[in-house]
C-alpha cells in the first residue's frame, strides 16, 4: 500500500470539506466548499440535500486531483458529518421529498413539549440516552411525514428512506445501492436503543415512523461497500463513518475511560469517553455511543454549549469592538483580568448542564472603569467557564477524574483562553499538532478497517503535542472567579424567570 492515502470527507453545517491523510496522519491535501443556509421561517433551518451531495462529491474529487493523484491512490474513504440533520428521499427515484431539516431547526419544539407532557421523557432517555428535544432526528422525520403531501402513504408502502447525512452520502456514492448508517449517527436520532444497539420498535410506534424507512446500522469502522459513482473512476472502499463529535473524540485518541476532548467552535462540544458501559446522566448531559470497532463499543457523555466562538463574532459584528476574530486575544491580554466583569452569553438560552431555553445574554459587574478590553476578556472567560460547568457535570456523573483536557477547533488556537481554561480546571489543557481532529478521526476509522494502520496502538502513537497549558492560578483566585460566574448565571436565569 505504498503511496496510498486515506480520504476523509467532513460534511459540516456550513461547508463540505475533504482531506487526504498520509500514513503518518499528516494532511496532504484539503478542499472546501460552502453551501446555502435556507431559513424558510424564524427557527427553521434547512439545507438542499442535492447541494450537500454535489459540494461533497466536488471537494472529494478536488482534494485528490489537486495533488496530481487519482482514485487508485485512495486506499479508503472515511465519512464524518453534522449529526441529527434529517433527509428523507424516494427509494425509486433517489430524490429527496423535502429539504434536509438541520439539527439547529426548532420547528418541532411544540411537538416535543407535548411528548414531555405525556410523561415520556424518562422512557426516551432510558432507551436512547437523549432528552426529548427537536435537536434530534426523530421529530423531524415525523414532521416530514405529517407535512409533505403523500409522504406518509409512500412511507407505509416502503418507498421512502430516511438517513442522516452520512447515509445520504453513502447512498449516492454507491449509486442508490447501500442504505446504512453507523452506531454514532443512529444514537443521535432519538429512535435508537443504545443498550440493545437496535432501532427501538416502541419509540417508532410512539412517533408513527415505519421501520422500513430506517438504514441498517453498522460499526463505525468496517467496509460498508465501494464507490460506484463518476466521482472516481476506480472503486474505493467506504470504510469509516462517525458523527462529527465522535470522530473528533477518536481523532484526539481519547480511547480510554475518563479521557475528554473539547471542540471550541461556534459552540463548544465536550465529550468524555466512559468506556464500555453507558452512564446515565443526573446532570443534564447526553449519553451516547462514542464509536464501535469490531464488537468493541465505547460510550460517552456529551455536553453542548450553544455560544462559544460566536460570542467573539458578536463582539466583532454586533459591537464593532474588534475588526477580526483573531484580534480578541491581544485586546483581552492588554488587561490582567476582566476586573469583575462577567458576560453570560445566553443569546440562545443556556445549553448543558443548565438547559434553560429562556435565559438571555447578560453582562454583570460593569463600572465606569470598564473598557473594551475588559469586555473582550469577559467574553473569552465565558467560554472557559461554560466548559468548566460541563466538565464538572461529567466528573459528577461518571465518578471519573479528568486527567487532562484535549482541545481542538478554531478557538483552541487562542493561547489566553487555553491558559485560563487550564487554570479553572486545575489540569492541563493539551493542544495537538493536528487540530483537524474530526477529519482525522474519520480517516483513522476507515484506515483501521482496511489494515492501512495495523491497530489502535499504531494510530495512538501518531498523536503529537503542539502545546501543553499547565494551571498556574492560585486556588483561592480560581474559587473567587468561579463564585462570580455562578452568581452571574443565577442572575441570568432569574431575569428570564421573572418575565413569566
From Swiss-Prot:
What SUPFAM superfamilies does this protein's entry cite? Actin-like ATPase domain
List the EC numbers from the record: 2.7.1.30
Q: Which residues bind glycerol?
A: 83-84, 135, 244-245
Chain residues that bind ATP = 13-15, 266, 309, 313, 410
Amino acids binding sn-glycerol 3-phosphate = 13, 83-84, 135, 244
Q: Any inhibitors or activators noted? A: Inhibited by fructose 1,6-bisphosphate (FBP).
What Gene Ontology cellular component terms go with this record? cytosol
List keywords of the entry alphabetically. Answer: ATP-binding, Glycerol metabolism, Kinase, Nucleotide-binding, Transferase
**Pathway membership of this protein?**
Polyol metabolism; glycerol degradation via glycerol kinase pathway; sn-glycerol 3-phosphate from glycerol: step 1/1
- Residues annotated as binding ADP: 13, 17, 266, 309, 410, 414
GO MF entry, a single one: glycerol kinase activity
Its domain of life reads Bacteria
**Which of the seven top EC classes does this enzyme belong to?**
transferase
Q: Which reaction does it catalyse?
A: glycerol + ATP = sn-glycerol 3-phosphate + ADP + H(+)
NCBIfam families, per the entry:
glycerol_kin (TIGR01311), PRK00047.1 (NF000756)
Q: What does this protein do?
A: Key enzyme in the regulation of glycerol uptake and metabolism. Catalyzes the phosphorylation of glycerol to yield sn-glycerol 3-phosphate.
Q: Per the similarity annotation, which family is this? A: Belongs to the FGGY kinase family.
Q: What is this protein called?
A: Glycerol kinase
Q: Which organism is it from?
A: Burkholderia multivorans (strain ATCC 17616 / 249)
| Lineage of the species this protein comes from | Bacteria, Pseudomonadati, Pseudomonadota, Betaproteobacteria, Burkholderiales
Amino acid at each position: 500500500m505504498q503511496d496510498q492515502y486515506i480520504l476523509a470527507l467532513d460534511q459540516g453545517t456550513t461547508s463540505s470539506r475533504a482531506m487526504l491523510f498520509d500514513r503518518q496522519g499528516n494532511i496532504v491535501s484539503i478542499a472546501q466548499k460552502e453551501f446555502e443556509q435556507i431559513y424558510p421561517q424564524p427557527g427553521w433551518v434547512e439545507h438542499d440535500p442535492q447541494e450537500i451531495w454535489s459540494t461533497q462529491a466536488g471537494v472529494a474529487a478536488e482534494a485528490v486531483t489537486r495533488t496530481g493523484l487519482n482514485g487508485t491512490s485512495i486506499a479508503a474513504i472515511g465519512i464524518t458529518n453534522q449529526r441529527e440533520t434529517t433527509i428523507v428521499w424516494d427509494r425509486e427515484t433517489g430524490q429527496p421529498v423535502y429539504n434536509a431539516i438541520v439539527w439547529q431547526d426548532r420547528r418541532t419544539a411544540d411537538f416535543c413539549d407535548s411528548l414531555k407532557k405525556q410523561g415520556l421523557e424518562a422512557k426516551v432517555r432510558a432507551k436512547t440516552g437523549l432528552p426529548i428535544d427537536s435537536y434530534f432526528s426523530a421529530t423531524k422525520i415525523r414532521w416530514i411525514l405529517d407535512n409533505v403531501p403523500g409522504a406518509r402513504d409512500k412511507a407505509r408502502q416502503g418507498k421512502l428512506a430516511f438517513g442522516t447525512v452520512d447515509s445520504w452520502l453513502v447512498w449516492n456514492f454507491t449509486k442508490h445501492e447501500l442504505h446504512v448508517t453507523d452506531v454514532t449517527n443512529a444514537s443521535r436520532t432519538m429512535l435508537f436503543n443504545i443498550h440493545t444497539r437496535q432501532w427501538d420498535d416502541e419509540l417508532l410506534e410512539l412517533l408513527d415512523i415505519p421501520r422500513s424507512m430506517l438504514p441498517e446500522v453498522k460499526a463505525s469502522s468496517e467496509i460498508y461497500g465501494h464507490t460506484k459513482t463518476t466521482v472516481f473512476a476506480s472503486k474505493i472502499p467506504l470504510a469509516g463513518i462517525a458523527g462529527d463529535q465522535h470522530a473528533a473524540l477518536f481523532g484526539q485518541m481519547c480511547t480510554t475511560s475518563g479521557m475528554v476532548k473539547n471542540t471550541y467552535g461556534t459552540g463548544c462540544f465536550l465529550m468524555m469517553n466512559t468506556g464500555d458501559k453507558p452512564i446515565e446522566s443526573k446532570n443534564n448531559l447526553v449519553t451516547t455511543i462514542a464509536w464501535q470497532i469490531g464488537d468493541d463499543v465505547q460510550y460517552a457523555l456529551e455536553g453542548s454549549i450553544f455560544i462559544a466562538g460566536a460570542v467573539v463574532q458578536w463582539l466583532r459584528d454586533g459591537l464593532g469592538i474588534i475588526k477580526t476574530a483573531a484580534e480578541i486575544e491581544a485586546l483581552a491580554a492588554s488587561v490582567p483580568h476582566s476586573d469583575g466583569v462577567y458576560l453570560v452569553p445566553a443569546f440562545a438560552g443556556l445549553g448543558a448542564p443548565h438547559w434553560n431555553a429562556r435565559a438571555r445574554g447578560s453582562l454583570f459587574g460593569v463600572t465606569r472603569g470598564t473598557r473594551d478590553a475588559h469586555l473582550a476578556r469577559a467574553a473569552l472567560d465565558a467560554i472557559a467557564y461554560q466548559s468548566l460547568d460541563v466538565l464538572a457535570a461529567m466528573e459528577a456523573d461518571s465518578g471519573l477524574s479528568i486527567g487532562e483536557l484535549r482541545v481542538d477547533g478554531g478557538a483552541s488556537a487562542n493561547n489566553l483562553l487555553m491558559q485560563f481554561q487550564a487554570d479553572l480546571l486545575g489540569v492541563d489543557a493539551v493542544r495537538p499538532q493536528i487540530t483537524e481532529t474530526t477529519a482525522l478521526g474519520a480517516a483513522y476509522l476507515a484506515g483501521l478497517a482496511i489494515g492501512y494502520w495495523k491497530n489502535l496502538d499504531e494510530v495512538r502513537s501518531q498523536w503529537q503535542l503542539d502545546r501543553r497549558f499547565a494551571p498556574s492560578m492560585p486556588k483561592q483566585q480560581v474559587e473567587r472567579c468561579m463564585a462570580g460566574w455562578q452568581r452571574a448565571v443565577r442572575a441570568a436565569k432569574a431575569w428570564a424567570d421573572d418575565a413569566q
